[in-house]
């Protein structure tokens, strides 16, 4: 009896050539496509393509709502940006994809799961680390990596096996996309001195072609999660889709940077994340209004560690769960509205309010005669605040002269 295998299928070149290759190894291939918000993708066409190139089954799952609510929401609450820039576009969808693949593998009594990652990238680690965590006995196939195909060899193999080739050698972009953004690499983008051409972008307008009039949008947050735009409540997935269009029109969310991959190499990456740019900026601004100072100062350390964990394939880990428990606790009072200005590639918070959780007291902050701040209390506070440093300096004279030195000068 032929053994069954579940393939993470995207419709692209890598996973399309994987199907005939896996069949040649003796597998009955079940192709699984997860709709996590790929822009402009025809899921029916992708499903049919998998069958055409040799899959015995082709399954499409609409996971947009689950992706937004269970995976994007934690990233927003934790302000996760890998190396301060990358909002986890590709890294974020992998844990959900693997969860679904493992479930389908169990339902169909499949013995193996396959992915189309290369040996150069992070995804091979993300896919396989999650599979090992969820089912250590599951076999893993990675034909592109294991066969060490180059892009040219893949295309040649595809042509030999009647697999449609969606790209050409002159523009061999490798694109991954979901609700949260779009990642583009390979081809001419591999030269870090080469400016990315406009055809490398799809979600954002070039700055010179953006509107000359700014657009404003009010983003409402409830417990740290975006719940409404301009007062209109909507599911998070719909909110992200709408913001991607609004912010993308103004050229917001383009990221062109050198990234430290977890496999040890540096990579030039082009990302587009319009909604992420707006929501992350708005969320941080509301936190500035509602979080107590010590929490606000400590949380960024947790955020950085969480971003590293997600990037490094450790979404399924006790440390991730523990740190997210802290983040969830901090978000209970992150309720309010932030007014965002969208203009010429920038998303700027220009106003904010939190009816019940704002820690901003205008009576204390004002410099007018209406101030309720007790300035007389400052003298004693300053003496106590600096007492330990004052005593240390008097004893050790690290930054001041000793009394004996002063006498010599006189």
From Swiss-Prot:
Pathway: Amino-acid biosynthesis; L-arginine biosynthesis; L-arginine from L-ornithine and carbamoyl phosphate: step 2/3. It is an enzyme of class 6 (ligase). Its EC number is 6.3.4.5. Gene3D superfamilies: Argininosuccinate synthetase, chain A, domain 2 (3.90.1260.10), HUPs (3.40.50.620), Single helix bin (1.20.5.470). The keyword Amino-acid biosynthesis applies. It is found in: Cytoplasm. The keyword Kinase does not apply. ATP binds at residues 8-16, 116. Keywords: Amino-acid biosynthesis, Arginine biosynthesis, ATP-binding, Cytoplasm, Ligase, Nucleotide-binding. One of its GO terms (biological process) is argininosuccinate metabolic process. L-citrulline binds at residues 86, 122, 126, 174, 259, 271. Homotetramer. It comes from the Bacteria. Its main location: cytoplasm. InterPro entries: Arginosuc_syn_C, Arginosuc_syn_N, Arginosuc_synth, Arginosuc_synth_CS, Arginosuc_synth_type_1_subfam, AS_cat/multimer_dom_body, Rossmann-like_a/b/a_fold. Belongs to the argininosuccinate synthase family. Type 1 subfamily. L-aspartate binds at residues 118, 122-123. One of its GO terms (cellular component) is cytoplasm. GO terms for molecular function: argininosuccinate synthase activity; ATP binding. NCBIfam families: argG (TIGR00032), PRK00509.1 (NF001770). This is Argininosuccinate synthase.
């Amino acid at each position: 009896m032929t053994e069954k295998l579940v393939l993470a299928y995207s419709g692209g070149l890598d996973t399309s050539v994987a199907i005939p290759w896996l069949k040649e190894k003796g597998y009955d291939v079940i192709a699984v496509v997860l709709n996590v918000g790929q822009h402009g993708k025809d899921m029916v066409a992708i499903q049919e393509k998998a069958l055409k190139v040799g899959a015995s089954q082709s399954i499409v799952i609409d996971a947009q709502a689950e992706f937004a609510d269970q995976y994007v929401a934690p990233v927003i609450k934790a302000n996760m940006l890998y190396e301060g820039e990358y909002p986890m576009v590709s890294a974020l969808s992998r844990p959900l994809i693997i969860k679904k693949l493992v479930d389908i593998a169990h339902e169909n009594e499949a013995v193996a799961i396959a992915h189309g990652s290369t040996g150069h990238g992070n995804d091979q680690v993300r896919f396989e680390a999650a599979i090992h965590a969820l089912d250590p006995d599951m076999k893993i196939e990675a034909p592109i990596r294991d066969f060490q195909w180059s892009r040219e060899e893949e295309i040649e193999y595809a042509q030999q096996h009647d697999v449609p080739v969606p790209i050409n050698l002159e523009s061999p972009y490798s694109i991954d996309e979901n609700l949260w953004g779009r990642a583009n690499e390979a081809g001419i983008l591999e030269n870090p001195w080469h400016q990315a051409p406009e055809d490398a972008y799809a979600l954002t307008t070039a700055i010179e072609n953006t509107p000359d009039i700014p657009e404003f949008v009010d983003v409402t947050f409830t417990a740290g999660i975006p719940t409404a735009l301009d007062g209109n409540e909507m599911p998070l997935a719909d909110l992200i889709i709408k913001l991607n269009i609004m912010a993308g029109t103004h050229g917001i969310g383009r990221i062109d940077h050198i990234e430290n991959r977890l496999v040890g190499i540096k990579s030039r990456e082009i990302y587009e994340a319009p909604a992420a740019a707006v929501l992350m900026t708005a969320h941080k601004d509301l936190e500035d209004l509602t979080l107590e100072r010590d929490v606000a100062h400590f949380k960024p350390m947790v955020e950085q560690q969480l971003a590293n964990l997600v990037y490094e394939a450790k979404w399924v880990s006790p440390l991730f769960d523990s740190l997210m428990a802290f983040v969830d606790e901090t978000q209970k009072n992150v309720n309010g509205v932030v007014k965002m200005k969208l203009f010429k590639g920038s998303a700027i918070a220009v106003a904010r309010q939190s009816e019940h959780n704002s820690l901003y007291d205008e009576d204390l902050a004002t410099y007018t005669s209406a101030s309720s701040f007790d300035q007389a209390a400052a003298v004693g506070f300053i003496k106590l605040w600096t007492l330990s440093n004052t005593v240390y300096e008097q004893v050790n004279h690290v930054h001041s002269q000793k009394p004996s030195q002063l006498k010599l000068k006189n």
